[in-house]
Amino acid sequence: HFYSQNKNSKPGDQDFISVMSLEDGNTITLDSQRAWHTPYGGNTVTLDEGESVIFKRSWTNSNHSLGTRIYSTNDKEMVVTSGSWGGRLKDNESSAQDIGIEQLVPVKALGKKYLISQSKTPNSTSGYRQGIVVVAVEEGSTSYTFNGGATQTLNKGGVRFHSIPGFNSTNTSSGPYAVI
């Protein structure tokens, strides 16, 4: 997803999560602190192999969708793609929008150590969303360090933002987590 602090929202701006089941009878649940629009009015849907569903969420008051959890309640396989329609890389920008799409990986494929390098944008960092690292915890209570700093702890679904101070950074943790 694109994350824009102080975003100027437009009616078409939205986040989405697309799920395709790889098995019959797959009960998919969306767990989020934010309000999502779902095809059946609820946050749970059952899909058969090859069937898919799209959840969408419109932007309101710069609220982001990071930390949203999508899972199979009966532990069946699925493919998940998520993204943002109308993301912006500059704060308070009403034009120059873009689309961001990510193919998610299973928690078992997440690592415990990441090397992160800063983007090489030609723009000044003032007001642009470059050089930001998002840490999203996937299981239980996870402790991590960012760039050798103090140990920080987040619970499942927790999200924290860090700025890269102009050089490569390293993240390590006690459990699996995603760096976005």
Q: Language-model features: where?
A:
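Conserved functional hotspot residues at active sites or interaction interfaces
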Residues: H1-G67, Y71-I180
